[in-house]
From Swiss-Prot:
Leader sequence segment: none
Catalyses which reaction(s): 3-hydroxy-3-(4-methylpent-3-en-1-yl)glutaryl-CoA = 7-methyl-3-oxooct-6-enoyl-CoA + acetate; (3S)-3-hydroxy-3-methylglutaryl-CoA = acetoacetate + acetyl-CoA
Disulfide bond entries: none
Activity dependence on pH, as recorded: Optimum pH is 7.
CDD domains named in the record: DRE_TIM_HMGL (cd07938)
Protein name: 3-hydroxy-3-isohexenylglutaryl-CoA/hydroxy-methylglutaryl-CoA lyase
Keywords: Lyase, Magnesium, Manganese, Metal-binding
Source organism per UniProt: Pseudomonas aeruginosa (strain ATCC 15692 / DSM 22644 / CIP 104116 / JCM 14847 / LMG 12228 / 1C / PRS 101 / PAO1)
EC code(s) of this entry: 4.1.3.26, 4.1.3.4
Lineage start: Bacteria, Pseudomonadati, Pseudomonadota, Gammaproteobacteria, Pseudomonadales
Thermal properties of activity per the entry: Optimum temperature is 37 degrees Celsius.
Amino acid sequence: MNLPKKVRLVEVGPRDGLQNEKQPIEVADKIRLVDDLSAAGLDYIEVGSFVSPKWVPQMAGSAEVFAGIRQRPGVTYAALAPNLKGFEAALESGVKEVAVFAAASEAFSQRNINCSIKDSLERFVPVLEAARQHQVRVRGYISCVLGCPYDGDVDPRQVAWVARELQQMGCYEVSLGDTIGVGTAGATRRLIEAVASEVPRERLAGHFHDTYGQALANIYASLLEGIAVFDSSVAGLGGCPYAKGATGNVASEDVLYLLNGLEIHTGVDMHALVDAGQRICAVLGKSNGSRAAKALLAKA
């Protein structure tokens, strides 16, 4: 069994996780979460999003969060910046890495960002050009790679095309997102094989939601395909405001438990991660969405 010896976890809880919460979240609580996550050993954290508060009110205050966090050496603190205005705001906050997002489904693209896939990619061109000028790295996301809430099945060749376009534009890595969590291990392997014909596996990442309880199976399938970067969210926070009924991202604690069992190195401390998840869940007044965290807390 030829699995990666090391995996990089991309912690998306502070951005993708919190953006769907209904109640306002204090900047101080967001700062504490990011600091807790970096202290747990996560070396890539998506801190916030520079988008219009009209569209994503929970991401208001991202500049203050960046100003307040304790930035540790060797940790990447990234932000979503889907347009030039957002990129410029991120730059003012000292952000060294940003992410842009496209979709593999035309219907999802129209409902999520109000334009076609082709138009959305064209919008990123000035962002990528500005990023090159300022030596800011750019990561690309693709939504709905294994299914769409409006279009149903998504052709892996369409995903491969979007991934190739993002890479050619200058994205150093492309994260493949199963936004509504319908993917299975077999479909995941077929998807990666298709996308890897256009983009090298070492430049791909997996982003799985657990709607049907398949996220860990899909991560394992991805590991078998040579993928060594995965997005996850502490305590399983998050969902998708544009995909009705979609549950949260796969929990970071659950992914870590899987990887620890496979003796794959991550550099993340499980107990510190569980504590970080419990603290933010207490702030939000909700139960922890991680099964591993709940099991470990029950033993404590």
